[in-house]
């Protein structure tokens, strides 16, 4: 996670943006920028965290070709997971920034809300199916509940 957040911080500094806060929360760290960052700067900053994870995975795949490295798996999974367009992940904030550039703000917000709801519903149904029929653990159901609570509290 530290590499991921370092990617955000370094790109923010390179873009001339100041950090207003860094907080440890239930889903990891959150970094808030000052309001000087424009839509395009935010897109670069939001993309840089997952990009660092994906580049680290690629680097270790090339470096240790015959290895089943946990580091590779974690960074690849973490980078891709953060690109899921849920509001509290980089992907959700990225979707919001892109839509804000292309569409009126209220329409962009509605699209993001619908996207969050649909993704949560799909994940919830899939996790229930896996729990009932595939005999897997229920952690994804708890993630859905946690995400839903976060979304409700955020409104």
At which residue positions do the language-model features occur?
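Hydrophobic transmembrane alpha-helices and their immediate loop junctions
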Residues: 1-155
